[in-house]
């Protein structure tokens, strides 16, 4: 049926003493990037314009039923692509807030510099932005963004958002072998962290088995970089 719910959920988990319900609110991958190492695969729809999807009304009803049944403390919007591209995201945030729950939004972060998307993200209690590469060449080659996007603008968009955001901004840095693990990478990353000034930093590596050999680093190197970045 075209109008069936398309939201999908992960099992409830506990994080820092809070019950978290993680929800995907896109029927397919709609994203402004097409990263070669994306665990979801290629972007079927490469866009930075909001879309309307059949079945959203039923999906929102299902979300409310799940909130009532599971009673989470936090709803984590973590979608197949860029969640901001669902044109009903405001209604979804309204529903979560009306039920007295906190909202965390995961976004790649590029759209946070645009006023219409900044306004939406500002309504969330927590926003997670991310960074994976440190050069323009790697950004274009590996993250394959929409034409005209630049790494400098990507970083400045997150920094601009953070400067005016009253909530908790979490900055997730994924270290990519050969791109952000080299000798000069730590200082570059420290400069970016200072520019964005997040409330929390998460340092991660590629864990998807399909991409580990080409893009992942050792646990030891991850620990080394994490210690350096968290000590600023």
Could you tell me what each predicted segment is?
Residues 2-22:
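Short, charged low-complexity linear segments at domain edges
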Residues 84-215:
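Conserved AdoMet/S-adenosylmethionine-binding subsite of the radical SAM
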Residues 41-76, 87-91:
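Conserved alpha-helical substructure of the radical SAM core
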Residues 171, 211-232:
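Short acidic, glycine/proline-enriched helix-loop-strand junctions
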Residues 22-24, 39, 74-78, 104-106:
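Short, conserved beta-strand segments within well-ordered enzyme catalytic domains
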Residues 38-43, 71-74, 134-138, 169-170:
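Short, basic/glycine-rich phosphate-binding loops at helix/coil junctions
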Residues 16-58:
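Canonical Radical SAM [4Fe-4S] cluster-binding loop centered on the CxxxCxxC motif
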